[in-house]
A protein has these predicted regions:
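C-terminal cap of thioredoxin/glutaredoxin-like
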Residues: 1-30, 64-66, 80, 151-222
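Short N-terminal signal/transit or membrane-insertion segments
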Residues: 20-26, 36-44, 121-133
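N-terminal, intrinsically disordered, polar/charged segments of Gram-positive cell-envelope systems
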Residues: 32-63, 85
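Short, well-ordered turn and helix-capping elements at secondary-structure junctions
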Residues: 49, 99-101, 181, 199
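Generic structural "secondary-structure junction" signal
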Residues: 53-54, 102, 135, 204
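Structural alpha/beta surface segment adjacent to cysteine/selenocysteine redox centers
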Residues: 65-68, 73-154, 187-190
């Protein structure tokens, strides 16, 4: 009887230890998952990326965005013009856009087209960029096609529609898009738009006051 009690006690102790270890493991995994869902701090490299503003501007704002992302459309229509007026046009900020492709084939096509425009007609890139967001419909549908991208290129750039379509078929600028994907992974970008002000991640992309205060703080620190 005594041996049975001792065995039961040992089993209870072992079971308790196992449960504690499992609970600790779950907590650690959850913490890692929560941390993994946040973009990491640190200034993203904009080498080879589209840039608007003076090269020597003291503050860099980077948008990780997707041309099929509705929230990115809101940022570019409502928030970006304020950044441009208050800081870019005054030489205080340079702005860069990095492609993120969360919405399938259409996202990739748009990214490939934007890379071609940037490489072949950089002066027209931002006009193409703006029109591409404006073209995004209010309802979820597959609207990004080679024909649509060709028409936009024709109306905003010097890139020939037939050349763009041919390069889309061949994925000529795939290496540039893959560089964007590598940067997304490095910065742990899991949501669009993700906005950086130098090495600071903006918590709410739609809060212009947060963006403005962060830029002003960075300017004072320069």
């Amino acid at each position: 009887m005594k041996k049975k009690q001792q065995s039961s006690a040992k089993f209870a102790v072992i079971l308790t230890i196992v449960v504690v270890v499992l609970l600790a493991a779950i907590v650690i995994i959850n913490n890692k998952t929560e941390q993994g869902n946040e973009a990491v701090s640190g200034q993203p490299s904009i080498k080879g990326q589209p840039v608007l503003g003076k090269d020597d501007a003291p503050v860099t704002v980077v948008e990780f965005g997707d041309y099929k992302c509705p929230s990115c459309k809101v940022f570019n229509s409502d928030i970006f013009p304020k950044i441009q007026k208050d800081f870019i046009d005054k030489g205080d900020v340079k702005f860069s856009f990095v492609n993120v492709m969360f919405h399938g084939t259409g996202s990739r096509l748009a990214a490939l087209a934007s890379e071609e425009v940037w490489k072949e007609d950089p002066d027209s890139f931002w006009a193409f960029h703006e029109k591409l967001f404006e073209k995004q419909p209010d309802t979820e549908q597959e609207w990004v096609t080679p024909a649509v991208l060709g028409d936009l290129a024709k109306s905003t750039t010097k890139v020939k529609p037939e050349t763009l379509k041919d390069n889309l078929d061949k994925e000529t600028f795939a290496s540039q898009v893959e560089k964007d994907s590598d940067l997304n992974q490095k910065m742990n970008v899991n949501a669009t738009p993700t906005i950086y002000v130098n090495d600071k991640v903006i918590k709410n992309f739609a809060d212009y006051n947060e963006i403005k205060k962060t830029i002003e703080k960075e300017l004072k620190g320069k």
